[in-house]
């Protein structure tokens, strides 16, 4: 009954949205014309073409600096040109480390040498290819260290507070942390701040392995050998090429010495599989880890430090490599010096069907549909710039260097930057500048969800309502007319535009029904994607529609559709949340002080007691 009522409400909302005539930034007469343009645009999109393009671009490894990366960039360039866009490649020269030595050994009390290898699978056609990057964390320090092993849960500040209460110090030791609950680079940074000499990060099966579902290739989740590669660059300091902070990494740019680059970590770091983690964790003795630290392996998790001794040796090639940014433009007819920018990266750790190519091919199909519109005589009022970035995975290299080289021009001309990355099956997800919330509400009301035949906006709101944890959250969702845009931190190519240049930004994707464990592994492949992520590529089309409508409306609006009332409301909400958090922290501190006082009273020796 509840499901029927929910679907009925969604159907009514979809009908209301279908009857929408007014569009922010457009007069009524031009709104009707814009809606017709969007219908023509939508008709030009093709799930079949998106799937074919995904298969072609993910056919081989294409990390930055590799022959595959150049080949992918050149294919994208030719596609843009074939669509009628004015396209070229901008090349930057950036630092990129690759491992030449990776050794992880348990030397006592038992001996074990980590495999550090993901095996090829018959069910995954590209998993056995050569030229795959090995499993590693970029921007780890060179280092050859041996020390006691300590389990630190997820390796976050709260976990080290727990260790301190237990009287356990990691200084001079090697820590092992679970992936998850934060960006991976936080884990070795916090470990170093607490005196650790090395950091191992592993994927626990409780998070994305057999505890979550069937493992690959039978199911979508991480098998025992899967490893998440990834950057651990300290991007809080600055993103992009570590040697050229603040300036574009052109061939002749002035560069720092590597020892002076503050975003490169100070200790060796290595990611491993749960197959390799199990012998290490089994060897730990000492204090039994708290219940909420226990994981999915069939062992009792201990913290150490004790008899378990680990040897970790990481040595890198620190090479200068080319980054190929593919830039394509459609010149505006009325305001050519106002730019609507759209971006997605093309580099991957290995084949990268999900991350990033599922977003890249959706963006390319948008460009194809815009090219078809150009053939009908349509021209955008503002200049549209499509950007296929290189080097996102190691640290937002391509987008950051482009933004640094063109910073003054972008600050003068860019009116919005619309980003995407990986894409999958499920619910609309949007983050960005809150002044664009109403703008995105109108767009998500105009795009129909492939599975439910209601708007993607209404399906998202229904999902939020069903999954809300408290009555307060449910009331807030029901009381808000549209959808909130999530605050953007970092982690994708919007970072330099939003946080360094102050350009209004959107970050768009679909997902939530495409869980799995392939992320940054050799199994992020076309075979995995077509089985478990978006088998019909219908959500690739949904992303093309959502981002494409945003591009079209921004490019053709008579007035740019910013609504700063949403920004004011969001800032006020954040201020309230900070105040409430401060009050809660004061209460918790007072309670902990009382508990400590009671503990001291109970444990203080009674000097008056007669024996």
What are these regions (language model features)?
Residues 10-17:
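Hydrophobic h-region of N-terminal signal peptides that target proteins for export
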Residues 20-32, 55-169, 174, 205, ...:
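Noncatalytic luminal/extracellular "stalk/propeptide" segments of secretory-pathway proteins
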Residues 28-67, 286-288, 421:
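N-terminal capping segment at the start of a domain
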Residues 53-56, 88-89, 149-152, 174-178, ...:
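Structural recognition of the beta-strand scaffold that forms the well-ordered cores
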Residues 127-162, 237-354, 368, 372-376:
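Soluble metallo-hydrolase cores and metallopeptidase-like ectodomains found primarily
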Residues 152-221, 333, 337-339, 349, ...:
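A conserved hydrophobic secondary-structure block that centers on an alpha-helix together
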Residues 205, 326, 342-396, 547:
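Alpha-helical metal-binding/catalytic segments enriched in His/Glu/Asp
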Residues 224-288, 335, 390-530, 556, ...:
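Metal-dependent peptidase/peptidase-like ectodomains
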């Amino acid at each position: 009954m509840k499901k029927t009522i929910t679907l009925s409400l969604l159907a009514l909302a979809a009908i209301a949205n279908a009857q929408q005539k007014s569009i922010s930034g457009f007069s009524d007469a031009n709104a009707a014309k814009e809606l017709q343009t969007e219908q023509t645009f939508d008709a030009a999109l093709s799930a079949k073409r998106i799937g074919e393009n995904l298969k072609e671009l993910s056919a081989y490894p294409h990390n930055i600096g590799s022959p595959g990366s150049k080949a992918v960039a050149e294919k994208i360039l030719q596609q843009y040109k074939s669509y009628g866009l004015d396209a070229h490649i901008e090349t930057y020269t950036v630092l990129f480390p690759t491992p030449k030595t990776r050794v992880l050994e348990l030397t006592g009390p038992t001996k074990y040498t980590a495999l550090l290898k993901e095996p090829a699978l018959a069910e995954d056609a590209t998993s056995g290819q050569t030229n795959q990057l090995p499993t590693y964390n970029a921007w780890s320090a060179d280092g050859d260290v041996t020390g006691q092993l300590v389990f630190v849960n997820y390796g976050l500040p709260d976990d080290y507070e727990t260790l301190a209460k237990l009287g356990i110090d990691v200084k001079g030791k090697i820590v092992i942390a679970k992936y998850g609950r934060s960006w991976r680079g936080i884990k070795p940074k916090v470990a170093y701040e607490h005196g650790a000499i090395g950091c191992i990060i592993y994927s626990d099966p409780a998070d994305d392995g057999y505890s979550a579902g069937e493992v690959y290739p039978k199911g979508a989740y991480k098998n025992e050998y899967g490893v998440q590669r990834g950057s651990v660059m300290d991007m809080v300091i600055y993103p992009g090429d570590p040697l050229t902070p603040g300036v574009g990494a052109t061939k002749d740019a002035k560069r720092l010495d590597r020892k002076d680059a503050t975003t490169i970590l100070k200790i060796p770091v290595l990611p491993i599989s749960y197959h390799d983690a199990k012998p290490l964790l089994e060897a730990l003795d000492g204090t039994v880890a708290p219940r909420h630290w226990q994981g999915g392996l069939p062992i009792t998790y201990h913290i150490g430090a004790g008899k378990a001794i680990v040897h970790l040796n990481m040595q890198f090639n620190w090479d200068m490599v080319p980054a190929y940014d593919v830039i394509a433009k459609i010149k505006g007819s009325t305001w050519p010096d106002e730019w609507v920018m759209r971006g997605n990266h093309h580099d991957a750790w290995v084949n990268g069907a999900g991350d990033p190519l599922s977003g890249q091919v959706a963006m390319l199909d948008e460009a194809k549909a815009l090219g078809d519109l150009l053939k009908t005589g349509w021209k955008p009022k503002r200049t549209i710039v499509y950007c296929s970035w290189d080097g996102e995975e190691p640290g937002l290299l391509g987008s950051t260097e482009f933004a640094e080289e063109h910073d003054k021009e972008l600050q003068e001309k860019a009116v919005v930057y619309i980003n995407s990355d990986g894409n999958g099956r499920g619910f609309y997800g949007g983050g960005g500048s809150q002044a664009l919330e109403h703008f995105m509400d109108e767009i998500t009301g105009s795009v129909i969800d492939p599975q439910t035949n209601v708007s993607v906006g209404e399906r998202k709101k229904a999902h939020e309502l069903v999954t809300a944890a408290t009555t307060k959250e449910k009331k807030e969702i029901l009381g808000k007319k549209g959808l909130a845009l999530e605050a953007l931190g970092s982690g994708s190519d919007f970072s330099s535009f939003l946080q360094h240049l102050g350009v209004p930004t959107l970050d768009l994707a679909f997902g939530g029904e495409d869980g799995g464990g392939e992320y940054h592994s050799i199994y992020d492949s076309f075979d995995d994607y077509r089985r478990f992520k978006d088998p019909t590529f219908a959500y690739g089309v949904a992303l093309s529609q959502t981002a494409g409508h945003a591009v079209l409306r921004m490019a053709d609006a008579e007035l740019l559709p910013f609504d700063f009332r949403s920004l004011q409301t969001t800032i006020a909400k954040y201020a309230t949340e900070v105040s409430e958090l401060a009050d809660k922290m004061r209460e918790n501190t007072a309670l902990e002080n009382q508990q400590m006082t009671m503990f001291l009273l109970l444990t203080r020796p009674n000097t008056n007691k007669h024996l």
